[in-house]
Amino acid sequence: MAQRSRVTLPQLQAMKERGERITMVTAYDYPSSLLADRAGMDMILVGDSLGMVVLGYSSTVPVTMDEMIHHTKAVVRANPAALVVADLPFLSYQTSVPDAVYNAGRLIKEGGADAVKLEGGQAVVPTVRAIVNAGIPVMGHLGLTPQSAVQLGGFRVQGRSEAEGEKIAADAAALVEAGVFALVLECVPADLARRITAALPVPTIGIGAGPDCDGQVLVYHDLLGLFDRFRPKFVKQYANLAEATVAALEKYRDEVRQGKFPDQEHSFK
């Protein structure tokens, strides 16, 4: 693939206005960032989902700022053309607005991210506004918000009732007014996502939100079949790399035990 120019916020906005779909995938280290960018992704999300698919936690809640910065730095070292968005982890922005601005700044200054993402609706509007006023682009996240999944009754679809749907739509409008450049809609009915997308001036990025969002995001390990602890309904698995990886490792194990590796081709004279 030819070298691309860096993706910018105005370009993403123009894509929405032209009806061009935006592509986004998570990455958590140098190799995944390199491959995602080589595939031509518009955005890379260094998600706190790394807690589950990389660090082995049962949820995103234990992920720390230092862990997010560590992984964001690795992603940025690949020098991707894609816009890099990093998650603000649990308790990095809920404690106070100054804490939120400081931690968002760390992801930009220390991690090298282009933008940050946080979860929540009208309750986080003052936080979003303060971070944006500090010169840091913010992506919102509504619907199923994993950091508060217990409060929401677990990992389930949000916005099915009329009242829930109206609240999500109102939250979306409030976040846009506060200055978000884009909005993730996770696990909401497709019709609700379509209506919100049509009403908002900024791009929506869906994950389990149907086909009518302005873009889509999936977890790297999910779409490549690298994480098999569970697979949400909305995940389409484009490869089964876990199976291929185990097969390769088994072949290596067998060749070592049988004395077939290393052979002359892989040895020095």
From Swiss-Prot:
Annotated source species: Moorella thermoacetica (strain ATCC 39073 / JCM 9320)
EC numbers on record: 2.1.2.11
Catalytically driven reaction(s): 3-methyl-2-oxobutanoate + (6R)-5,10-methylene-5,6,7,8-tetrahydrofolate + H2O = 2-dehydropantoate + (6S)-5,6,7,8-tetrahydrofolate
Function comment: Catalyzes the reversible reaction in which hydroxymethyl group from 5,10-methylenetetrahydrofolate is transferred onto alpha-ketoisovalerate to form ketopantoate.
Self-association state and partner proteins as the record states: Homodecamer; pentamer of dimers.
Cofactor binding annotation: Binds 1 Mg(2+) ion per subunit.
BP GO terms, sorted: pantothenate biosynthetic process
Residue positions binding 3-methyl-2-oxobutanoate: 48-49, 87, 117
Subcellular location: Cytoplasm
Active site as annotated: 186
Molecular function via GO: 3-methyl-2-oxobutanoate hydroxymethyltransferase activity; magnesium ion binding
GO CC term (a single one): cytoplasm
Record has Nucleotidyltransferase as a keyword: no
Pfam families, A to Z: Pantoate_transf
Family: Belongs to the PanB family.
Cofactor needs: Mg(2+)
Chain segments annotated as transmembrane: none
Keywords for the protein's UniProt record, in alphabetical order: Cytoplasm, Magnesium, Metal-binding, Pantothenate biosynthesis, Transferase
Main localization category: cytoplasm
Organism classification: Bacteria, Bacillati, Bacillota, Clostridia, Moorellales
Pathway: Cofactor biosynthesis; (R)-pantothenate biosynthesis; (R)-pantoate from 3-methyl-2-oxobutanoate: step 1/2
Name of the protein described by the UniProt record: 3-methyl-2-oxobutanoate hydroxymethyltransferase
PANTHER family to which the protein is assigned, alphabetical: 3-METHYL-2-OXOBUTANOATE HYDROXYMETHYLTRANSFERASE (PTHR20881:SF0)
Binding residues annotated for Mg(2+), in chain numbering: 48, 87, 119
Gene3D superfamilies per record: Phosphoenolpyruvate-binding domains
